Amino acid sequence: MKGIPITLEIAAVTDIGRRRARNEDNFFVNGAFIDHYKVRAERFESVDTEEVHVMAVCDGMGGLTDGDVAAMIGVTTLSDHADELQAIRTGEDASFTANRIVRTANDRILKRIKKTGKKMGSTFAMLVASVDCLYACNLGDSEIYIKTRFGMERLSKPQTYAQELVDSGAVSENQAGRSYGRNQLSKYLGMDNLKALKPNESSAEIRTGDILLICSDGVSDVLPSHSIYASLSSDRPVNEIADTLIEKALRKNSGDNMTVVIARVLDDGRVARLRRRLGIALGITAGVVMLTVMIAWML
């Protein structure tokens, strides 16, 4: 049976920032991504009605040689798996496909490293949204949020050495936020420890009016959660909200590339699903009535 589409208003914006010589971030929105290098700023806007929406941010690791290449490999691998992504119907489907994409992208980056001798790596933060599930996964420190009428929730978990110290109880969240290790990634695309290559995964439900956000650490490192929440609480178009987040990060003197992907749920598909179920129920009821009448007539 054909799936039920949902409608999202989406905006993606990336900016090189004030201190970096090149932009090593990339984004992916339902098949659209930055397909060239030496990008200072880029944006994408759309209102899409799809059965499955896929959005992602890949932040190339600036301390390595070819971070932009690693980020490009991340988004092109998503593009190469478009058919599998569109076939997702459940959270289990999403998890299986996402982990396969992560392994494929990681393998491609390792092969590139072996071929060129240049070190590279990238974060990976992805959302899959459909009428039946909202699935999130991340490698590294790119963040994922959902803002609902009840508040804002972070769906990602930083995969950094500082976060590992927090998880072990060695330091507090506040101490980790000030530590050097907060930007040292423990997991990322391009790592050679394949046993540790496991993204953080989470899920949620979406409703009409919810706001979804994926951003690189050039934004999340300098903007506290209450500032992000204030921006996401606006009724303005999502492209304006995206611009506001970038502008806020610039005012905070973010020294990194900055990328945001924002989506507002315009139609969560639940009304259409209810109508379909009601139609099926009525069809079954009508069939039972007709069968009963036929049996009675034959008797």
Please name every model-derived segment.
Residues 1-299:
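PP2C/PPM-type serine/threonine phosphatase catalytic domain
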